[in-house]
């Protein structure tokens, strides 16, 4: 198991540098927020993970085109937190947004699309909607 609190410490130091060096809507700031969110997620602090994933997402929405794969990843990260928290309707909402971007931005045989289908199917499975899960 990783030392997530140590990772978080370094992610936060890096983020402080990014904040001083980059404009507030720079995608690298969003990537930094995502890394911090990921550390909180791995530590089991899902509300903090969600907070940082949402900060990242707000920057990506402003800085990137609407079909950019990083936006899809951002939606997926948020969906993952909601899945773990058991809020399946919210998880589906974000996984489906992610999937729509991936369908537009990626080739039909891209592994990330397979992951997207799997995420949506897993949520339906968790909800007990097994026939719907099998569609994915």
Regions found by a protein language model. Name each.
Residues 10, 130, 136:
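Cationic, low-complexity basic patches in intrinsically disordered or flexible, solvent-exposed regions
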Residues 15, 27-42, 57, 69-84, ...:
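Conserved alpha-helical positions within TPR/SEL1-like repeat arrays
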Residues 20-24, 62-66, 104-108:
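Short coil/turn linkers that connect adjacent helices within long alpha-helical scaffolds
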Residues 3, 61, 70, 96-103, ...:
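Intrinsic-disorder/low-complexity detector
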């Amino acid at each position: 198991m990783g030392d997530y609190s140590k990772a978080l410490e370094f992610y936060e130091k890096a983020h402080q540098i990014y904040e001083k060096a980059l404009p507030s809507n720079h995608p690298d700031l969003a990537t930094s927020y995502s890394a911090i969110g990921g550390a909180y997620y791995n530590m089991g602090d899902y509300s903090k993970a969600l907070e940082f994933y949402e900060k990242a997402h707000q920057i990506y929405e402003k800085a990137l085109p609407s079909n950019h794969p990083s936006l899809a990843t951002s939606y997926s990260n948020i969906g993952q937190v909601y899945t773990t928290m058991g809020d399946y309707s919210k998880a589906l909402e974000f996984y489906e947004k992610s999937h729509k971007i991936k369908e537009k931005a990626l080739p039909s045989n891209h592994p990330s699309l397979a992951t997207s289908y799997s995420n949506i199917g897993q949520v339906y499975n968790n909800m007990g909607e097994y026939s719907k899960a099998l569609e994915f």
